[in-house]
From Swiss-Prot:
Keywords: ATP-binding, Magnesium, Manganese, Metal-binding, Nucleotide-binding, Nucleotidyltransferase, Transferase. It comes from Rhizobium johnstonii (strain DSM 114642 / LMG 32736 / 3841). It catalyses: L-seryl-[protein] + ATP = 3-O-(5'-adenylyl)-L-seryl-[protein] + diphosphate; L-threonyl-[protein] + ATP = 3-O-(5'-adenylyl)-L-threonyl-[protein] + diphosphate; L-tyrosyl-[protein] + ATP = O-(5'-adenylyl)-L-tyrosyl-[protein] + diphosphate; L-histidyl-[protein] + UTP = N(tele)-(5'-uridylyl)-L-histidyl-[protein] + diphosphate. The active site is at D258 (proton acceptor). ATP binds at G96, G98, R99, K119, D131, G132, R182, R189, D268. This is Protein nucleotidyltransferase YdiU. Its cofactor is Mg(2+); Mn(2+). InterPro entries: Kinase-like_dom_sf, SelO. Nucleotidyltransferase involved in the post-translational modification of proteins. It can catalyze the addition of adenosine monophosphate (AMP) or uridine monophosphate (UMP) to a protein, resulting in modifications known as AMPylation and UMPylation.
Length: 500
């Protein structure tokens, strides 16, 4: 049992090169993790550790202590970041890392800088009477979803490790405690900018913007108006990101401004879920009672959040307020067109088209309307269409996606007519479609089954199996065909919950 913090024992397990700690002291609060009773390493992402240039052998040896927060690695400068945020439309001027502690930063072999953060590592000055801890269920969920998003090719924070703490956490029930180690390009959020803007701290906004440009958008240093260019670049990355969410049926669930990164990575997977049957109004998050963050609302919420970012940057964009507003408005108004372009390009890939013609949007919308009316599973329908693109014999299986199999006949006729003008061969098309239409997603019921086995029985075999399947989402994996299937009525997950 490790009962107290130890420092500097593991040597160079983490080659830290910290920069955020060099910002003004009111950007964060120095905060060491709180030791736990009996940490046990559930999972170490050895491939990611190697990519980051970490000492994998040292992490195998000391990982339970390091990733629980009991053993602070040499070079770490642990801190909790300050930020604010709009939560379901209401502004909170002070949120901050209430259960997360940034150990420091590392630079990988390609020169990219990443944060190493512990979630559930104990209370911080931003905990707001919380215990700063996390339960094992949300930790496993975040591990599964973040690694699945990576495998799907969607920018997202990564999972480096998960540990149990040997201590209970007290929620609606008593649950086993755990700590999650997250890797991110950075943890700077729209809400980080809002924190300083809400205090009238223009110097703080400027220091943060300069840091973000230097870290994430260095080419913008040469722009005529670097701060306007920064706003434009963040809008572009978010438009592309949210389009990718929609392409795989992902519903974030809690798109508050403190959960939107300026790096363009998906972050915070608490109540997120993947859609089964296609319905644009789908909501899973238990706290989203009015559907603010429903599947189809996500692009508009993204624009709303980015407008809040633009507001914080106005004093930097132009000293003349009206001119600053006009310039920022021009950027935010372009978001809709950008999103639509990214979304349509991806949807055309999903139905096998290499180029765009007039009428293609109508073809996509017709399929989505048919899927909604017929209760078709989002992921399976597009995967089966990929199979049909390469083999007409797969038509009965595609038709079986719909409650009334004959209902898809008219759409298939239109689709095939359109394919006749597409330059790809059938084989090329099928290969391309299978590379964008996954066979496997983190089905909500599969995630819950893995969590329940771990929580109730200490059995992590389903967790490991699910991680393995989801690491190759675009491969058929015949031995795991059951993981492709949507839930039976008795298996449906109706609501997801915040946790980490």
């Amino acid at each position: 049992m490790t009962s107290a913090l130890q420092k500097n024992r593991p040597g160079a397990a983490f080659p830290f090169d910290n920069s955020y700690v060099g910002l003004p002291p009111h950007f964060f609060a120095a905060q060491a993790p709180t030791a736990v009773a009996e940490p046990w390493l559930i999972k170490l992402n050895e491939a990611l550790a190697a990519e980051l240039g970490l000492d994998v052998e040292a992490l195998r040896r000391d990982g339970a202590a390091i990733f629980s927060g009991n053993l602070v690695p040499e070079g770490a400068e642990p801190l909790a970041m300050a930020y604010a945020g709009h939560q379901f439309g209401g502004f909170s001027p002070q949120l901050g890392d209430g259960r997360a502690i940034l150990l420091g930063e590392v630079v990988d072999r390609s020169g990219k800088r990443y944060d190493i953060q512990l979630k559930g590592a104990g209370p911080t000055p931003f905990s707001r009477r919380g215990d700063g801890r996390a339960a094992i269920g949300p930790v496993l969920r975040e591990y599964i979803i973040s690694e699945a998003m990576f495998a799907l090719g969607i920018p997202a924070t990564r999972a480096l490790a998960a540990v149990t703490t040997g201590e209970p956490v007290y929620r609606e029930e008593v649950l086993p405690g755990a700590v999650f180690t997250r890797v991110a390009a950075s943890h700077i959020r729209v809400g980080t900018f809002q924190y300083f803007a809400a205090r009238g701290d223009t110097d703080g906004v400027r220091a943060l913007a300069d840091y973000v440009i230097d870290r994430h958008y260095p080419a913008l240093k040469e722009a005529e108006n670097p701060y306007l260019a920064l706003f434009d670049a963040v809008c572009e990355r978010q438009a592309a990101l949210i389009a990718r969410w929609l392409h795989v049926g992902f519903i974030h669930g809690v798109m508050n401004t403190d959960n939107m990164t300026v790096s363009g990575e998906t972050i915070d997977f608490g109540p997120c879920a993947f859609m089964d049957a296609y319905d644009p109004a789908t909501v899973f998050s238990s706290i989203d009672q009015h559907g603010r963050y429903a599947y189809a609302n996500q692009p508009g919420i993204g624009q709303w959040n980015l407008a809040r970012l633009g507001e914080t940057l106005l004093p930097l964009i132009d000293a003349e307020p009206d001119s600053a507003v006009d310039k920022a408005n021009a950027v935010i108004k372009s978001y809709g067109e950008r999103f639509q372009a990214h979304w349509l390009a991806g949807m055309l890939e999903k139905i096998g088209l290499a180029g765009e013609e007039d009428g293609d949007l109508d073809l996509v919308q017709a399929l989505l309307s048919l899927m909604q009316a017929q209760g078709a599973d989002f992921t399976l329908t597009f995967r089966r269409l990929s199979d049909l693109a390469g083999d007409d014999a797969a038509e009965p299986e595609f038709a079986a996606s719909f409650r009334e199999p004959d209902a898809c006949g008219a759409w298939l006729t239109q689709w095939r007519e359109r394919l006749s003008r597409d330059p790809q061969t059938a084989s090329e098309r099928a290969i391309a479609m299978r590379s964008v239409n996954p066979a496997f997603i983190p089905r909500n019921h599969r995630v819950e089954q893995a969590i329940e086995a771990a929580v109730d029985n200490g059995d992590f075999s389903l967790f490991e199996a699910l991680l393995s399947v989801l690491s190759k989402p675009y491969e058929d994996q015949p031995g795991f065909a059951a993981y492709r299937e949507p839930p039976k009525p008795s298996e449906r997950v109706l609501a997801t919950f915040c946790g980490t």
